């Protein structure tokens, strides 16, 4: 129990470090942001998921990059067995090298669908109010909306795969969704 608790604490420290980079993302200071992400990954390796995501979340809300990410996750869900083989190969040299082959992954039935739906509310609200989000074109809100879309996509993937491993990745983009919710309502 203690190892899981301390692992969660380490991950949240990494999340907070990356959240501090929000202003850097708004100013498109990618090199500095990546350096902070790499520093955060020394605390928790899952922080590395943010390196590709910082490029996905840039631009207009519901842009082509987020749609491609949606299609990629949809394909991963449909092809879950090859996806887990890819994940196992990708993580082979990290602290998560036994991720796919261990008993926890095999016995994990994924994230609860209600949890995934709850955390998808900011993305759903932004889809409903897409015209308003596009018209306002606020850099803060578009970045937060795109983070919300990534949160929904990652939670959807965790419903069909591992709630313990994949289900903890959305925390890196969930907090920005909380910024968007009051604006979207």
Predicted stretch roles:
Residues 1-4, 32-56:
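Membrane-interface alpha helices of multi-pass inner-membrane proteins
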Residues 4, 20, 78-82, 152, ...:
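Transmembrane alpha-helix boundary/anchor motif
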Residues 5-12:
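Short acidic/glycine- and proline-prone juxtamembrane loop motifs at membrane-interface regions
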Residues 13-16, 46-47, 176-179:
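Residue-level signal for the membrane-embedded core of alpha-helical transmembrane segments
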Residues 18-31:
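Membrane-interface transmembrane helices that cradle and orient dolichyl/undecaprenyl
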Residues 58-171:
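Alpha-helical transmembrane segments and terminal signal-anchor/GPI-anchor hydrophobic tails
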Residues 165-183:
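Hydrophobic/aromatic-rich transmembrane helices and adjacent perimembrane loops
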